[in-house]
Amino acid sequence: MEDTSRSKFSDVDEYGFKRAQNFDYKTYEKFMSSYLKTLTKRRMKWEALLRQNTDLTIIDAKLKRYIRKGIPGPYRPDVWMKISGAFKLQQRSPDLYRSLLNGEYEKEISDSILIDLPRTFPDNIFFDTKKEKLYNILIAYAHHNREIGYCQGLNYIAGLLIIVTDDEEKSFWLLKTIVENIVPQYHTKNMANLLRDLAVFKEMIIRRAPAVNRRIENLDSLSKILLGRVYKPNRKSE
């Protein structure tokens, strides 16, 4: 394990995740010493862009290029809300989230979520204080979208949204937008779009990385990997 006492970087990253034991602090410091200048310039460009296009209603080539290069952390919550369409959904039903929290809950759904709370990012140093928010988001969404309800996998999506946005209601609307609009039918019972995308992904590996595909086939692990990812989202917590 590398000694971190001489590094100006913590052994925990900015999101609260512990860095790997073999994390190369020396190389990271060298990289960041120059990359911080890039991040500063990028933030200044985003500031100028947001002054011109506050609502991000104009999704042009420039905005797409900026997004691909990276959205500065402080701007991510609002930018995600606007470019995903979550902000517009929230505006149409501003009281929805609170009304869902004030409604009655099904015990089976609540119990499933409670089982998964301690399993969600247990090594994240910040997450203990966010578990109540995670529960609220998941229980509200499960009762809002009865077709999907609650299934394993949603806790990690919602958990990451909370970590990045630090906003419970924004995380709910982003979760709703992701599950229903951005990757629809990934978490439904038939998982139609997920199965389709996995098939496309497999075909891409075969065509573009045949050596990798042969290695996977030799290990006989592809089916296990795919089946594990496919069936995990809709398994009830045990």
Segments from the language model and where they lie:
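Long, repeat-rich segments with strong aromatic
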Residues: 226-238
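Hydrophobic/aromatic-lined pockets within catalytic cores
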Residues: 84, 88, 139-146, 162-167, ...
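Classical protein tyrosine phosphatase
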Residues: 153-156, 160, 168-174
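Alpha-helix N-cap/N′ positions at the starts of helices
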Residues: 58, 62, 153, 223-227
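Alpha-helical cores of eukaryotic small-GTPase signaling modules
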Residues: 98-137, 171-227
